[in-house]
Amino acid sequence: MPADHNPSIKTSHGVLHLIPVGLGEAPISAWLPPDAQILAGQLSTYIAENAKTARAFLKLTPLTRPLQDITIHELNPRLDDATLQTWLAPLRSGVSIGLVSEAGCPAVADPGARAVAIAHQWGVAVKPWVGPSSILLGLMASGLDGQRFAFHGYAPVEAGERVKQLKAWELSSAKQHQTQMLIETPYRNQAMFTSLIEHLKGSTRLCLARALTTNDEWVRTLTVAQWKSQPIPQLDKFPTLFLFQAAA
């Protein structure tokens, strides 16, 4: 429903624009539509997961003002709600604001979801723009169930708890015919891969989606039993999405 016909949307307010950021070194033309590039270059205020990467992103857009004149608030999970509401307050005066993640789509596995929730509480229009999402791209390329899936973020760091959690997710996958997705800090990727092939069932299908949209992109899905007979893939230093689906 158009904003001007939706009584819950206040047309005197600005718009919270959810603008994706690239996952790697590909040119901006490969992952962000021209209209979104133009819009991104026009906004004067941003809320970002990481101010440094937000500035790097903005340098790729057709800026209409000097970069130093753009306000960038850095959002982290520990930020109090009162401060976040203060940053978003210009929306209620008709000023539009951009929301960006460190990489990929904002507000998906990202603290920016808090800003979106506040915008909805205030009746502010929220505009999501098309762009890269490692979760969606990895799922697309995996060949696993794309209708029932769950993204869990990080598994526990402690070895015993990690194994317990992986087995619980595998059981859930088998019962619900559901793809399970998780990530790890790049320097722990090799250890995570080892945990997966050591503790998941041999019939479980496991996909590695490494460095999506970059020159080092590599995606492969095999059963756990098949992975055990393969050379160990190089995963350290590369953002990697792990996906698996257990046999019913």
Question: What are these regions, as identified by a protein language model?
Answer:
Residues P2-H17, T71, V95-S96, A174-A248:
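A contiguous loop/helix-start segment that scaffolds small-molecule binding in enzyme catalytic cores
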Residues P2-L75:
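Glycine-rich, flexible N-terminal cofactor/catalytic loop recognition
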Residues H17, R114-S172:
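Class I SAM-dependent methyltransferase SAM-binding "motif I" and its flanking Rossmann-like core
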Residues A40-Y46, G123-K127, T179-Q180:
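Short active-site oxyanion
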Residues A48, G98-P106, T179-E184:
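Acidic beta-strand-to-loop metal/phosphate-binding motif
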Residues K52-A54, G104-C105, S134, R188:
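Alpha-helix capping/helix-boundary segments
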Residues H73-D80, A155-A159:
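Conserved helicase motor
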Residues D81-V126:
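Glycine/small-residue-rich loop that forms an oxyanion/phosphate-binding "nest" at active or ligand-binding sites
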